Amino acid sequence: MDRAEKAEAVSSLNATLSNAASVVIVRNLGLTVAQSTVLRQQMRDAGANFRVTKNRLAKIALDGTSYTGIGELLTGPTAIASSTDPVAAAKIAVEFAKTNDKLEIVGGGMGDVILDVEGVKALASLPSLDELRGKLVGLLQAPATKVAQIAAAPAGQLARVFGAYGAKEAA
């Protein structure tokens, strides 16, 4: 890599980290290309980003972001997973690490907060923004559905009374 390529890599990673709601640092020693490709695809499907970068360049890219404190986690062969959804990157990394012992979660960050391994696992156990939105819509729709059922119930009962009265008259 020449100086211009390094500068481009740093600015690209800095832009990604500046927009990220959470960042997860993983150690990827021993991952095969196929396993790494599967992990990258899962991250992409979840709207997350997964990059293997030189630690020195990653530390430079962290400057000027809210994640400057996680630079100390960048030792050895590491990769950075980031996402605009606060739980997406953590959730995918933790799930992948459960099935593949070659991927080790080192830590991460969420805003100014530095997370250890347990913090990342706790973050991964939270529901995603889409799941929370679905639950909220369900909670908001439930009372409206009940109100509609209650409002329709007297009319239905009245119709049944008239129907029974009409059947009684006809008989």
UniProtKB/Swiss-Prot annotation:
Cellular component terms per the entry's GO annotation: large ribosomal subunit
UniProt record, GO biological process: translation
GO MF annotations, alphabetized: large ribosomal subunit rRNA binding; structural constituent of ribosome
Domain of life of the native organism: Bacteria
Pfam families per record: Ribosomal_L10
Entry keyword set: Ribonucleoprotein, Ribosomal protein, RNA-binding, rRNA-binding
Keyword presence, Disulfide bond: no
Matching CDD domains: Ribosomal_L10
InterPro entries associated with the record: Ribosomal_uL10, Ribosomal_uL10-like_sf, Ribosomal_uL10_bac, Ribosomal_uL10_bac_type, Ribosomal_uL10_CS_bac
Keyword Transmembrane helix carried by entry: no
SUPFAM superfamilies found in the cross-reference section: Ribosomal protein L10-like
Chain's role: Forms part of the ribosomal stalk, playing a central role in the interaction of the ribosome with GTP-bound translation factors.
Family membership noted in the UniProt record: Belongs to the universal ribosomal protein uL10 family.
Subunit structure, as described in the record: Part of the ribosomal stalk of the 50S ribosomal subunit. The N-terminus interacts with L11 and the large rRNA to form the base of the stalk. The C-terminus forms an elongated spine to which L12 dimers bind in a sequential fashion forming a multimeric L10(L12)X complex.
Protein name in the entry: Large ribosomal subunit protein uL10
Organism: Sphingopyxis alaskensis (strain DSM 13593 / LMG 18877 / RB2256) (Sphingomonas alaskensis)
